[in-house]
């Protein structure tokens, strides 16, 4: 694990040390305790998303200890969707939904999974592949929004009997309530092509980026990299934006961008300035993706998005 806490000593001491700093299961690091005699390695925090269970097993193998795994899905041999998400590199938009998915699988039920990306391998026990995201319990997609994949599943509604007149339905008819929001797993398949004026600050780039994400309906965590022309490779505002977002910056020379295929919005001014008629759209397309959001200009910054295909696998690494 690249972000983990390993304690050598009593688990209780480790718990007291960790407790004041626990924030969220999506951001907390793995926490593992191993006793001084190297007999037991115990995951204490972030067993699935943080990888503490896996770390405990790794430490146990190295020290000749016994890993003490207590998470219900692992104990019962049930698929852990959050472990799969971590291994597949997917971000969790609404972690509160993990419990609902796991609870259904633990009770012997089934869940439907919809993915915008191909997934190789046999689905785990209890998981069905859905062709309609509106009927999915798990949605794997770069697109954001509370309604993404939202559904009303007639077989699992939890309505109550209401009197006539309140819903316009006859007395005794159950009012159908919407199903819970699906677990949304964000796949990092978006390339953000970015152009900017010289000296553009990180805040201006972030503002334009978030505006574009909102208009495109894209989760910001779906962006895998930023791309631009090579003359912007040392633009401090752009570099600071990428550092804050923890994404790489790909740069391309003007002659390479000019050969990128696809429909773009040409600009004579941009051509005269940097040698190619468009930066953001061509940079977004340079990695071979499909343009899904054309140029947005805001505050001296231009942003465009392309989507690349990423093949996922049900096999955990």
Predicted regions and their residues:
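C-terminal non-catalytic interaction/assembly regions of soluble proteins
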Residues: 210, 221-282, 288-291, 297-301, ...
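C-terminal edge-of-domain segments
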Residues: 136-145, 184-185, 281-317
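A polyampholytic, Gly/Pro-enriched intrinsically disordered region
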Residues: 51-60, 89-94, 267-281
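Conserved mixed alpha/beta catalytic, RNA-binding, or beta-rich assembly cores of soluble enzyme
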Residues: 4, 8-53, 58, 62, ...
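Low-complexity intrinsically disordered segments
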Residues: 154-155, 164
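N-terminal glycine-/serine-/threonine-rich phosphate-binding loop
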Residues: 1
């Amino acid at each position: 694990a690249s972000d983990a806490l390993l304690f050598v000593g009593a688990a209780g001491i480790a718990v007291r040390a960790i407790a004041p700093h626990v924030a969220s299961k999506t951001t907390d690091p793995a926490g593992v305790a191993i006793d001084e005699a190297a007999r037991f390695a115990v995951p204490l925090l972030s067993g699935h998303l943080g990888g503490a269970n896996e770390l405990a097993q790794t430490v146990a193998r190295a020290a000749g200890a016994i890993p003490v795994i207590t998470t219900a899905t692992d104990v019962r041999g049930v698929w852990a969707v959050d472990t799969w998400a971590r291994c597949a590199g997917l971000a969790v938009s609404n972690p509160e939904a993990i419990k609902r998915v796991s609870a259904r699988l633990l009770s012997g039920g089934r869940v439907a999974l919809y993915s915008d990306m191909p997934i190789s391998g046999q689905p785990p026990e209890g998981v069905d592949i859905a062709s309609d995201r509106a009927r999915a319990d798990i949605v794997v997609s770069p697109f954001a929004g509370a309604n993404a994949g939202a559904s009303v599943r007639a077989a699992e509604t939890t309505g109550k009997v209401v009197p006539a007149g309140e819903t316009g339905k006859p007395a005794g008819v159950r009012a159908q309530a919407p199903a819970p929001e699906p677990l949304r797993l964000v796949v990092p398949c978006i390339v953000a092509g970015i152009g900017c004026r010289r000296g553009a600050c990180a805040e201006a780039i972030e503002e334009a980026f978030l505006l574009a994400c909102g208009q495109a309906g894209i989760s910001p965590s779906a962006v895998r990299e930023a791309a631009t022309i090579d003359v912007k490779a040392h633009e401090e505002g752009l570099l600071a934006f990428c550092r804050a977002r923890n994404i790489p910056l790909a740069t391309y020379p003007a002659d390479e961008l000019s050969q990128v295929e696809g429909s773009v919005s040409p600009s004579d001014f941009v051509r005269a300035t940097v040698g190619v008629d468009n930066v953001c759209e061509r940079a977004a397309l340079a990695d071979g993706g499909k343009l899904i959001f054309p140029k947005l200009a805001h505050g001296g910054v231009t942003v465009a998005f392309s989507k690349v295909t990423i093949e996922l696998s049900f096999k955990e690494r």
